[in-house]
Amino acid sequence: MAHKMNVESFNLDHTKVAAPFVRVADVKHLPAGDTLTKYDVRFCQPNKEHLDMPAVHSLEHSFAECVRNHSDAVIDFGPMGCQTGFYLIMIGEPDVSGTCELVETTLRDILKLNTTPAANEVQCGWGANHSIKAAQEAAHTMLNHRDEWEQVMA
């Protein structure tokens, strides 16, 4: 990388990370005094593996719904275009350990679901493109590596 780019993740050397992990991707201090922290919640090793779209889509719906049972600080949970993880945006200063606990609790909730929340054409733009089973498999794999989440670099 010759020069610093505007997008934080474009400055991350994806060949040097060891997924899965949770890391602070950005912190914004807003004019009114609030702080937003964006976390990179990485499920898959970049350029080696990825989540299939139905898994991504069901993880997005399930996590977004379940996480709000545990925290009012969640702003958004959205997928990365590369399909290797998600961005979790929260109100507050960075707290990787606390966020890892929140992610763990939420993924455990997802394992208990029978269906993907709002996976229908009334509540979703592509209601047929879901797989709760694939989402749960990805959640299970992520949870199996829980002790590694705070170690980002290989």
Swiss-Prot record:
Amino-acid positions noted as binding Fe cation in the UniProt annotation, renumbered to this chain: 57, 61, 124
Residues forming coiled coils: none
Enzyme class (EC, first level): lyase
Co-factor(s): Fe cation
One of the protein's GO biological processes: quorum sensing
The reaction(s) this protein catalyses: S-(5-deoxy-D-ribos-5-yl)-L-homocysteine = (S)-4,5-dihydroxypentane-2,3-dione + L-homocysteine
EC numbers: 4.4.1.21
InterPro entries membership: LuxS_sf, Metalloenz_LuxS/M16, S-ribosylhomocysteinase
GO molecular function: iron ion binding; S-ribosylhomocysteine lyase activity
Tree of life domain: Bacteria
Keyword terms: Autoinducer synthesis, Iron, Lyase, Metal-binding, Quorum sensing
Cofactor note: Binds 1 Fe cation per subunit.
Record family assignment: Belongs to the LuxS family.
NCBIfam families reported for this sequence: PRK02260.1-4
Summary of the function given for this chain in its UniProt record: Involved in the synthesis of autoinducer 2 (AI-2) which is secreted by bacteria and is used to communicate both the cell density and the metabolic potential of the environment. The regulation of gene expression in response to changes in cell density is called quorum sensing. Catalyzes the transformation of S-ribosylhomocysteine (RHC) to homocysteine (HC) and 4,5-dihydroxy-2,3-pentadione (DPD).
Assembly behavior: Homodimer.
PANTHER family (UniProt xref): S-RIBOSYLHOMOCYSTEINE LYASE (PTHR35799:SF1)
Name of this chain's protein: S-ribosylhomocysteine lyase
